[in-house]
């Protein structure tokens, strides 16, 4: 089978290509240029070409910067401007890695696209990886169901520690096996504020208000804050912790309250991606990547791709713009971006 492998120059994508070649497939590699972080691509392309030479496979260099800006970077900047908390990796997987790259693979005669994500596809459903510490099902939950028949994830049934150990046994991969893992947003060097500062003045002080609109303090600029944050702003004469419970971008205002004020049981979603036919169902849900799963009842409006999620217990720090993913056991059955 002809398979295109998304290659980054890291251990996971390199071992993905190696596993598939050893299984007898005709493998091609593709490195995607997605952003303009200085010096980033040169080193990665060097690594990808080195692996390509070792494996004897063709390596494509694909410039997707325009698409990346349109579907990932620009929305990232815009959502922070609107006082929301974006999830760029979910958009990148949907529109770029399993969107534009899949199209490129097909144009080049490949039957499948493979990536180094730690996730499985079982019976047409995105399913949690065998290694729970590396599971990326959350970030792939916006990928359309019809795409899943064309993609494979060879690392989904493996443990990361085993992958790194295997990589140490291959001479050309030795420098990759010991390199630090990248876990942050690829186009963010240090903090997201540095990215936003290229487009806006984020340091515009404003008022901190309570739930009733009373001015009780000052902040350094609303884009510095996300829902649930409790530091970096001043509350006059405060003796107990205050948490950001709402961001009013138009007024350059943040609303603060107690931890109890952060609690939320009803969540509204938009851009819902549904993997099942039902429009009413019970599930377990994650309101952000690192949050525990909470039981919920979901009502979906398929025509508008919106949903109402009623949790069985309070969730803390529900942030507009973040991805909410719904599970049935280990299977992803729906996802949507938090609207309210």
UniProtKB/Swiss-Prot annotation:
It catalyses: S-sulfanyl-L-cysteinyl-[protein] + uridine(34) in tRNA + AH2 + ATP = 2-thiouridine(34) in tRNA + L-cysteinyl-[protein] + A + AMP + diphosphate + H(+). One of its GO terms (biological process) is tRNA wobble position uridine thiolation. SUPFAM superfamilies: Adenine nucleotide alpha hydrolases-like. The record marks 117, 322 as: Interaction with tRNA. It comes from the Bacteria. Pfam families: tRNA_Me_trans, tRNA_Me_trans_C, tRNA_Me_trans_M. ATP binds at residues 6-13, 32, 116. Transmembrane segments: none annotated. GO terms for cellular component: cytoplasm. It is found in: Cytoplasm. Residues 134-136, 288-289 are annotated as: Interaction with tRNA. Its main location: cytoplasm. The active site is at 92 (nucleophile), 186 (cysteine persulfide intermediate). GO terms for molecular function: ATP binding; tRNA binding; tRNA-uridine 2-sulfurtransferase activity. Its EC number is 2.8.1.13. Keywords: ATP-binding, Cytoplasm, Disulfide bond, Nucleotide-binding, RNA-binding, Transferase, tRNA processing, tRNA-binding. Disulfide bonds join 92-186. Belongs to the MnmA/TRMU family. Catalyzes the 2-thiolation of uridine at the wobble position (U34) of tRNA, leading to the formation of s(2)U34. This is tRNA-specific 2-thiouridylase MnmA. It comes from Campylobacter concisus (strain 13826).
